[in-house]
Regions:
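Pocket-edge positions in alpha/beta enzyme catalytic cores
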Residues: 44, 73, 244, 291-294
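Short coil/turn segments at secondary-structure junctions
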Residues: 115, 119, 176-180, 240-243, ...
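Mid/C-terminal beta-alpha module of Rossmann-like enzyme folds, strongest
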Residues: 209, 216, 220, 287, ...
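Short, solvent-exposed turn/loop segments enriched in Gly/Ser/Thr/Pro and often Arg
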Residues: 216, 273-276, 322-324
């Protein structure tokens, strides 16, 4: 049904809890709005609480019956991630869908997180890896209590095709290119989502790991990069006509919504828009995965490296339950 799937096909979601990182703007907010209109219970996880409050107020205007809460979560800080996850797990409530959406893009100069990681890899990859692992008990609880499989939805990018993973330089310490660091983070996101799906399959787990990408969406993240060489070149070539190559935020959210709600979305699936070489469109379908993103041994090594860097271990091939290292 992917070729004909639309947001109207989202089923009623009453009783299901969705956590969306970076839900205050862009694709995250657009997805939250569609889910709210289908009666989902939402957790909006945002770094900037002021912007989060504004987004929540706007959401309540557009979907007055929404059940939503705002939580503070800084994915560039393991302290923040651990604090939030501990509070959430203590509530003993199931989490049916985790949408790992937040991200930073093409930071001009190499910047470090509070934990000493390169900002894009630390936020986009390690932050979400740790968050997912620390929330795993809530996903397992949902699996036990619901017949509808819980899902981890990872937002990747067509940018993953433009680079290869440098396992020995994940932090871009040897040389820093703003765009390449972003591309590597998105490649890592996709490889980890695929690796998660394989581990879940081997454990016969009902939980699904699904990836999606928005095409090229006109979001705050994209606009924040508008002083890059790429953006300047595009403006010079196309001026205002560039909009024909960009999804708006609502269109950009469709692959995420498909991955998060469609009964046809599969474990290990990767979905995106189907027009203009996957750059835009209202039609959602299977997205192309670069051959180098399918390297299973490299993905397994990346998973282990993320465990070592974050101190969070889950879906371990030698363990049946989540184990967190003492940092």
């Amino acid at each position: 049904m992917t070729g004909s799937w639309k947001a109207e096909h989202i089923p009623q979601l009453a009783g299901r809890r969705f956590l969306i990182t970076g839900a205050n703007s862009g694709i995250g907010y657009a997805a939250a709005l569609k889910l709210a209109r289908k009666d989902a219970e939402l957790i909006l996880a945002c770094r900037d609480l002021e912007k989060g409050e504004a987004a929540l107020a706007h959401l309540r205007e557009e979907a007055p019956s929404v059940r939503a809460e705002l939580v503070a979560l800084d994915l560039s800080s393991l302290v923040s991630i651990r604090a939030f996850a501990a509070q959430e797990i203590a509530r003993r409530r199931p989490l049916h869908v985790l949408i790992n959406n937040a991200g930073v893009m093409a930071i001009p100069t190499r910047t470090l997180t509070s934990d000493g990681f390169e900002m894009q890899f630390g936020t986009n990859v390690l932050g979400h890896f740790a968050l997912t692992g620390l929330l795993w008990p809530a996903l397992e609880q949902a699996a036990q209590e619901s017949s509808d499989p819980p899902r981890v939805v990872t937002i990747a990018s067509i940018a993953h095709k433009r680079t290869h993973l440098e396992l020995e330089d994940l932090q871009s310490a040897r040389s820093y290119s703003p765009l390449r660091a972003y591309q590597q983070s998105k490649l890592a996101n996709l490889m980890l989502a695929l690796e998660m799906s394989r581990r879940l399959r081997r454990k016969n787990s009902p939980i699904l790991s699904i990836a999606a990408h928005p095409g090229v969406a006109s979001t705050a993240l994209f606009r924040a990069h508008n002083d890059s060489n790429l953006a300047r070149a595009l403006r010079k070539l196309a001026g205002q006509a560039i909009s024909i190559f960009l999804n708006d935020e609502a269109e950009g959210a469709l692959p995420t919504l498909y991955a998060a709600t469609s009964p046809e979305a599969e474990n290990g699936g990767y979905y995106g828009p189907q027009q203009l070489n996957e750059m835009k469109g209202e039609i959602v379908g299977p997205a192309k995965i670069a051959d180098h993103a399918r390297n299973e041994s490299l993905a397994a090594a990346l998973w282990s490296r993320c465990e070592d860097l974050t101190g969070v271990r889950y879906l371990d091939e030698d363990r049946d339950t989540l184990t967190e290292k003492i940092a």
